[in-house]
Structure formats: C-alpha cells, structure tokens
Amino acid sequence: MSLFKGKTLLITGGTGSFGNAVLNGFLNTDIGEIRVFSRDEKKQDDMRHEFQAKMPDVADKIKFFIGDVRDIDSVRNAMHGVDYIFHAAALKQVPSCEFFPMEAVRTNVMGTDNVLAAAIDEGVKCVICLSTDKAAYPVNAMGITKALEERVAIARARNTDKTKICCTRYGNVLCSRGSVIPLWIEQIKAGNPITITEPSMTRFVMSLEEAVDLVVFAFEHGENGDILVQKAPACTIETLAKAVCELFNPETEIKVIGIRHGEKMYETLLTNEECASAVDMGDFYRVPADKRGLNYDKYFNDGNTERTALSEFDSTNTELMTVEQVKEKLLTIPYITEALSNWEK
C-alpha cells in the first residue's frame, strides 16, 4: 500500500459493501485520509459508529461527505485535495433500473461524467470506475448505462494525461448489499423455501476482497482508458443455492420463480472484440483503449489489420465451480462465517 502512503482517497457510494471492504482493508495502513461520499446520512452515521467501535485508533482517518454524484457541486465540495478516487456510486438493481431507466442514466452515466469532470478539474491523479459484466453485450437498462459509463470514462481519458482513468468490470460479488445470498439466508432462517430464478443460469462469482484487489490492481497496473477484469470462476444459480443450503440447512426446499426483468442466462466479462486486443496479465485481463482519432483516412494505409480471433470470456466458458468449491469459497467470507456462528439449526 506504499502508493497510498499519506494520500487522500475518495470513495463515491462509499457506504456500500465495496466501501466497507476498502475501509476494512485500508484503515490500518499508512493511508492519510479516506473520504466517504454518499447520499444516505443514516448509513454514514451507522458506518461512523461501527468503525469508531472496531477501529478506534484509526477511525479519525474517515471523513464523511453527504452529496449525490448527480450534483456536481456536491462532488466538487468533496474533491478538494483528493489524490485518488474509487467511483462506486451506482444504481445496480437490474429490475429497478428496467422500471426507472432515466434514474439509472442520471446516476450511472451523468453522475460518472460529473465525477470525472470534477476530478480532472481538481487535478486528481487517478480515478477507478467500478463497472459490471452486464456492460458487455448489455440487454437491460442497468447494463446499458454501465456500458455508457465505460464509454464516458474512455472518452474522458482520451482528453487528459494528468488524470489516469480506468474501469474495472465485476461479476457477482458474493454477499454484497442487495445480492441474493443474504436474501436466501433470511429465507432459510424463516423456514421458507429459497427462491431462485433459473437453475441453469450462470454467473461469475467473486468475494468483496477480490473486488478490492481488482481495483488496486487497476490502480497499480492500468493505463489511461483501460478496462480491467479478473479471470473469475463461475457457477450455476442452482449450484450456488445448493451450497448455501448445505451450509445452513440441507433440508431447505429450492423454489424456481423464473427469470426477472432484464436478466440474461449468462454474463460476459470480455466481448469477442475486446478479447482480440486484451493483454493477459496473469490473474487479470487488461483491455487497452482504442486511441485512434476520428480521422480514419490515415488508418487506411497505416492501420493494423491483424486481429487475433478469440471467443468471448463469459460465465459458460470459464471455470465452473462445483457445490463443494462454492462452499469452500463461501466459508472464506466473513458475512457467511458470522451468519453461521449465529445460526441455530
């Protein structure tokens, strides 16, 4: 964490699961200050009390700013003196965005542009924008707006060399706020069947710690305009559900309710076109931005016509985890171990 020594980090949407994971991982380092920017004063107050209780010696490093990425003035107010930004603020619930697509546009697209414009004006050194696998071949409003968020970031990156701007794409972050596992655990506790959409549906899976690792990797190794992804494994929804049931109550019934608005049978982290230019970096892929300008005439003679033919990287052709492998992964997640310790079978 030497790159963060004495630095000020701003996290938009900072009271969410990602922000909590960053605070847990960064507060005990030599970072100077972490600013939490979000709309919900109650969540900020809860977070303040939580970290004062569990990390009293370093909790003063956290500074809270109430605001909305839709309001550029509130964004600028939080950004004075900031070195780095992790931009996590978003509307991310797929069905909700289907019913309120313009709200998703205002937060995910226009809000991102506000953050980037203010960051460039304030001389911020690096901005990492958190995106999603739903931005690749998007079929729903949330994915479409996150795809546009990436385009906004890449367009901004083309026009600045003082602020490095990168995007990271995630699959499903296990046990994050609003995700399915906390719902299933509550259903099991209540003695009800757990509800799944479609058993054969596949999803990439990663932990919150892996989500933070991806952002830090992008921060350290990404270049301006890059999209970075982790080579994440995947599993079927049925496999994930069986793993949760076996951990908490193997007698729990699994009830299929059908696909919700805007959902896909599988997700894609890199498209065919992106795979053709992707750089293999071990556990990660880096997709460099297309740095060409709009004057295509000069590329008729000078352009590179050779492209490697590759298939997309999606949740059907990555490693598919078994029930036992998913259980092992779940048992590394504090949310699960805490829930199990409080569980009375």
Q: What spans do the regions from the language model cover?
A:
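Hydrophobic/aromatic anchor residues within beta-strands of the central parallel beta-sheet
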Residues: F64, A104, I165-T168
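Conserved Rossmann-fold cofactor-binding substructure of NAD(P)-dependent oxidoreductases
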Residues: K63-Y84
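Rossmann-fold scaffold of SDR-type NAD(P)-dependent oxidoreductases
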Residues: T12, M79-A88, C129
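Conserved Rossmann-fold NAD(P)-dependent oxidoreductase catalytic core, especially the SDR/UDP-sugar
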Residues: H87, L91-R151, R156
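N-terminal Rossmann NAD(P)H-binding glycine-rich loop of SDR-like oxidoreductase domains
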Residues: K7-T29
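Conserved residues in the N-terminal Rossmann fold of short-chain dehydrogenase/reductase
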Residues: S38, F65-I66, R106, E198, ...
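Strand-loop microenvironment adjacent to phosphate/nucleotide-handling motifs in alpha/beta enzyme folds
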Residues: R151, A155-N172, R177-K345
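Conserved glycine-rich Rossmann-like NAD(P)H-binding loop of the short-chain dehydrogenase/reductase
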Residues: D30-K43
